[in-house]
């Protein structure tokens, strides 16, 4: 039985993926911020066909201390993890800083999956890492001297940059840990509660455009495909849309930038820079 850890599992793409993965017979460990929501999705996944007890984990992934605690709990329970789905993410209207000193978008969307993946690396040997990226990465510009967006803040640009980080992380993870299958995907523009923290253009667009957006179930297909399919087992370091490999932006294919981001992220997360080499 394939064990899949899903972060951001309580709504949208994560919830839809969890239910479909359970329907296909996967064992699940679900991660979310709200214990009641985690419990509710676990029950829905179990009803969809989950054959094994579903692990329920509560963590605020904007805090690296909670990422570390989550990793410890997962390591204590599971000797092997077949798939880690780094799905948790959000967009924030204004710049906020976590108690640990990180800009909120960067912490949740990039640093948390970077740290969690590295802390679980030995449990993932031979497995898959699937990260939810976005075509919004094309609007992002990564400045290694301003990872915390202190010079200026635009919600969509900062979100796009965090998704660019996801692709660069995936690319560098594939290079450093070739025994893994690390890939990321664009889910499309999905009808979810995503962007509810934004009071600007994204909130307007989601209100007007919602009838034309994809369902969470449609948006989750590439996640499920990358997690379980035989075809995806042949991929490493790729960016996928609609279950096919596509080419990301020029900056997303910059190997030197990917290496530099990895080293800076390891430093910020308190990891050795040679982790996963």
Per-range role (PLM):
Residues 7, 151, 155, 205-209, ...:
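A short, mixed-charge helix-start or loop-turn motif at secondary-structure junctions
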Residues 1-193, 268-276:
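Rossmann-fold NAD(P)H-dependent dehydrogenase/reductase core
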